[in-house]
């Protein structure tokens, strides 16, 4: 017999430890959480909630099946760190293109109409993250999330051909939200209207979100009146940096961003096209893929571009829009994680439903997954009775503020990208020095990597009053992983990679010597671990406590360590 898990269990180790419930093709009448939309935000929330058999979760989507061809492809360092918690980061890294360096090209002062390389830098500065910035199709990321959910105790899968119609709220009911869903038959002919009662609803249904409209929120913002095209191509070219992420500013033909795709063949090109008149829509331009190819050739001169195949292309307008809140709290309610604010919040929006960005900075999918990662565990903690419902108010407080920062960055980045480069012939105030643009790109590296996020004080986040006790771990920021050696088996690993999306709270003790831990661990075990751990459960079932010690691991005697650390 072949053993797969723990040396004695003949089963797939990727499957849930608890008995797996079969997926039910019909929609239930009552659920704890109803997720509307199976994009990056919806799947991230679903992946987190799929770990808990005691939480009933349903995902609906009006599409007829999973995403086949994804528009987004850039995966920030922080997102890859997040994938560790779901167990598929290694698969992403194996399949993806790694963005190691970025090259910058500017107009050639010696030859009019030509471009020349002006710089080449690291895409991610050393020490920022143990994970790289990578490129992989959004559809493939969806595949990993879907597999993770299927392997969980709920066997969770989206219900496709199911469209959200409307909802109503009755706070006196055990399931306060009544949601109407239109279900299409598999042949696409017949429809059936069904009612689902839910405790919480999360709208992850994109920029035209019907959930957002149902709670009276709207996206606010503007456009830059600039058309851009994007295409994934198989091409022959003598451009020397075709397998590097490359930023090109030509003198008069516009700008372009080149991003190699996974697999070693395709290349994605973002191509600046025409200016739009105020109020003009890009659809009126009747742009074609041939127009995109011709523009790319002009920008890349003197280098040649022979496109053999276009696997996907699209055109878009640069625009940034933001919703003022990401939940259905009433006006005037505080959003700092207070009890009063949460009592008004049962419906949430995430991803493009709450914010839209231009694609070139590669933030859209990453921020959407970050929204889901932020909200998913909070819903689980509340529904499992581990936290007060007031923590749910921190979601909008934290993520809306971050989205506002991203939009400000995206607006500046898009403006600089579309500006004509300063040359000997062009010195007007609206132009940008290529060297200044490169410096700006480098300066914003932490931001685009997703590791500069710092949440403000709230119910969950301290005010930094004791920050001096651990200056290397900033209160409100993500836990920066570091290499360690596990004492028990001398295995070298990353500390942050030991924390899975399993709903447990983490308590890390940083100590100089093992002898310093005895009294503290005894106190924490009595007043914290035993207090919150259900009778009969493992001592780390709710709070996972670990110690990080200095010095040689060989000098540590396991027999002398506190039992709660073993």
Segments (PLM) and residue ranges:
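A conserved short coil-to-beta-strand element within the FAD-binding core of flavoproteins
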Residues: 160-177, 316
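Glycine-rich FAD pyrophosphate-binding loop
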Residues: 47-73
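Extreme N-terminal leader/targeting segments of oxidoreductases
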Residues: 1-33, 48-55, 174, 341-342
């Amino acid at each position: 017999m072949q053993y797969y898990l723990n040396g004695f269990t003949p089963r797939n180790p990727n499957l849930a430890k608890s008995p797996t419930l079969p997926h039910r093709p019909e929609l239930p009448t009552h659920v704890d959480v109803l997720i509307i939309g199976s994009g990056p935000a919806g799947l991230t929330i679903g992946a987190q909630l799929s770990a808990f058999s005691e939480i009933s979760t349903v995902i609906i989507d009006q599409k007829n099946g999973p995403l086949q061809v994804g528009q987004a492809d850039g995966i920030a360092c922080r997102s890859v760190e997040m994938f560790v918690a779901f167990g598929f980061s290694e698969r992403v890294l194996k399949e993806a293109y790694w963005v190691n360096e970025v090259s910058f090209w500017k107009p050639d002062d010696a030859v009019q109409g030509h471009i020349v390389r002006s710089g080449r830098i690291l895409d991610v500065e050393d020490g920022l993250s143990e994970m790289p910035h990578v490129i992989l199709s959004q559809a493939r990321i969806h595949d990993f999330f879907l597999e993770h959910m299927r392997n969980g105790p709920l066997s969770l899968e989206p219900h496709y051909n199911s469209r959200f119609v409307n909802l109503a709220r009755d706070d006196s009911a055990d399931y306060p939200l009544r949601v109407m869903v239109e279900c299409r038959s598999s042949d696409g002919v017949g429809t059936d209207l069904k009612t689902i009662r839910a405790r919480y609803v999360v709208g992850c249904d994109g920029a035209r979100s019907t959930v957002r409209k149902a709670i009276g929120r709207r996206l606010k913002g503007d456009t830059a009146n600039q058309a851009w095209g994007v295409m994934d191509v198989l091409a022959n070219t003598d451009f020397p940096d075709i397998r590097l992420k490359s930023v090109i500013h030509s003198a008069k033909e516009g700008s372009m961003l080149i991003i190699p795709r996974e697999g070693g063949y395709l290349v994605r090109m973002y191509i600046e096209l025409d200016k739009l008149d105020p109020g003009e829509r890009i659809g009126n331009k009747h742009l074609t893929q041939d127009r995109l190819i011709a523009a790319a050739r002009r920008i890349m001169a003197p280098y040649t571009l022979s496109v053999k195949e276009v696997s996907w292309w699209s055109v878009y307008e640069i625009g940034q829009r933001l919703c003022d809140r990401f939940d259905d709290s009433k006006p005037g309610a505080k959003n700092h994680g207070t009890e009063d604010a949460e009592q008004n919040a049962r419906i949430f929006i995430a991803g493009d439903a709450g914010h839209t960005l231009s694609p070139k900075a590669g933030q859209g999918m990453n921020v959407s997954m970050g929204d889901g990662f932020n909200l998913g565990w909070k819903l689980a903690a509340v529904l499992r009775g581990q936290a007060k419902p007031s923590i749910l108010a921190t979601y909008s407080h934290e993520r809306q503020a971050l989205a506002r920062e991203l939009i400000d960055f995206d607006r500046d980045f898009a403006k600089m990208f579309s500006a004509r480069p300063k040359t000997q012939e062009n010195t007007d105030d609206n132009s940008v020095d290529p060297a200044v643009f490169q410096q700006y790109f480098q300066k914003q590296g932490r931001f685009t990597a997703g590791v500069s996020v710092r949440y403000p004080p709230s119910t969950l986040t301290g005010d930094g009053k004791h920050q001096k006790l651990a200056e290397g771990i900033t209160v409100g920021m993500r836990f920066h992983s570091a290499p360690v050696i596990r004492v028990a088996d001398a295995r070298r690993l990353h500390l942050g990679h030991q924390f899975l999306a399993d709903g447990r709270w983490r308590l890390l003790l940083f100590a100089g010597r093992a002898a310093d831990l005895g009294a503290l661990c005894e106190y924490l075990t009595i007043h914290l671990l035993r207090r919150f751990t259900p009778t009969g459960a493992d001592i780390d079932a709710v709070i996972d406590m670990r110690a990080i010690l200095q010095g040689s691991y060989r000098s540590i005697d396991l027999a002398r360590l506190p039992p709660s650390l073993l």
